[in-house]
């Protein structure tokens, strides 16, 4: 149907519809749509139908919205308004490629429409179609050459395309149009100058950049950044004398910034240790309160000189009471000689302070206050905790608590020691004690919640967080709204350890949604940053968004999701009623009655929990509806509800795992775990070339990784078991695997691996697993290798020992309950406080308790 021109009355109504849409008065907009469409002459008016659909979409009525917009487009396919509206609808559904097509169709009908061009440019930068973005910004510059956003947008397009010369020409052309007096400081002009300078530095125009920053120095607001840029450029240009003066000035401004000292050392080209120490001594005299010029020499000096400097450093900090002292010195603990000196000094202080209130019994003068001994004991607790001497650490922290039972740091440290020991319940208990001393401290509250989650106390952790969340909603929901990802990743791990895979997957998908929302939130900044001239921050934002899923929170969530989906593929959840029938066949009447009673109680409990959750959901939906009705804000449509029961019973777990894997392969390719997770997925899918790709990439990162060793042997064994592979695939596999195995059979390859890593328990465990995998008759030898605890083993830490004990229980070595018990007792003697090695409670009634107990401590893998 051709475009129908509306008469003046209806035309005014249509303008009011547009105004209502812009002002978010959607109900009024629908009234005006109805007034036009109720007239039989204009009942099929395409543009009005399209606007009605767009308005309905803003009210959350998505299906009706599409129906009206498509109808409007069919009725007036030559209208740029209809195509534009259809593009806006697609954009609201995150179908950006489709939206771009709609905008392009609209521009064919009205090539100079500013609003469509602006909307198109937003989508192009969002999708990183930089070539298309440059063309669109050029059109906008031609149409609106007086608008600053036109120039800036066009320049940014060239900058992102790394055409620095053109970007600088455009920025300079625009800068010359700005009427800013030389002595006036204008923030937006200052940002423009700094952005211009950033482009110059990225183009390696160092001399021009230095001249530029010096020319406009008076008009730049951020004076500190100017000095830092000067120092960086002068160093690169080799103008070392000038650079040294700049870095000295920077140190005068902030004597605690380690980077300034590094720059000063480079500028002065100091070759000897004495010269370096002299520089630090001079700075220390100029800035007597600064810690850094006294701390950095401790990294440089050895032996007796270190003892002398460390003695002075420790005494000053203990006397004034410096809680983060150990954190300041922790980076020195790679050097065993320095650790011994620190230990000797501080233990002597403690002994002397106890007897005579001096650091040394040979001193005179003013006595140290009682708090000095407290901080010395606090330091020693941290020191011995770092060295893995947990009994001593506990002795010192208990002594400190006995003298000052109101200091939060002491209870915090005690909880930390128990965490490192592997007793997570006790750690949570002491962190709760610390939290109770100051309930208004959000940091300690969060730490307490985190420790509770590590101990699988999910409900208690939620209650702890509820002290700082909005009233009227559950803490879990509120933390999700706030994108509190540390809490969610810890919840994922806790649910995973408890076998509540549906709940864990729900949290994984929530984290995935957060990252999607963060990416989507860029839209607000594409126009805002150009308007406010925060161009450096804007370019940094775009670059951050490009690698957003490299973040540790995403990696943790994705890794857990993949592991759970692999587990669900290997052991699909069975129908409970069928499972009960199978179990009941072999039970006596008494046992059957007991089992049925237990099941009824469990069902009743589950039903009550489900009813509570349902009531909570209904209440939240009512609140959301009320909020929408009151505010009449634009709604993006309700998200699909994440139901744990559905998530853990997906039809194809491997396909779901691949969805989480793809961002990791694109952005975290330097992490070996990415490729080993990929191998595990492709191994189950039977994709041999993709398996090969994964192990090759992992091999290039770390050829001696224990998990990779297991994957290589399983892969090679699987290839040899599949004789029906296509010839070309077999040829490629044999050629590539030959490079790794170097003409060795699997047994020899495994033996070499064990010999090479005879002092590493993690490697011995993987080698022993593969020994049993290749030859079941060698069970005893494999277990003997995995359970070695002699003095030559270097990594006898809690994490690794628990890993071995779990391997003895999970079937990696077949049935070996007696060997597990022997190993548990040996580990208990080695680590008496670790929960995983304590004698299992009520073993007769529950033989699997040990497995469940040790499984709770997987969390230590990333903590110790």
Swiss-Prot record:
UniProt entry tagged with the keyword Repeat: yes
GO cellular component: cytoplasm; cytosol; extracellular exosome; NatA complex; nucleus; transcription regulator complex
InterPro entries hit by this protein: NatA_aux_su (IPR021183), TPR-like_helical_dom_sf (IPR011990), TPR_2 (IPR013105), TPR_rpt (IPR019734)
Pfam family of the protein (one): NatA_aux_su
Region: Disordered, residue numbers: 603-638
SMART domains for the chain: TPR
Alphabetical UniProt keywords: Repeat, TPR repeat
Name of this protein: N-alpha-acetyltransferase 16, NatA auxiliary subunit
Gene transcribed to yield this protein: NAA16
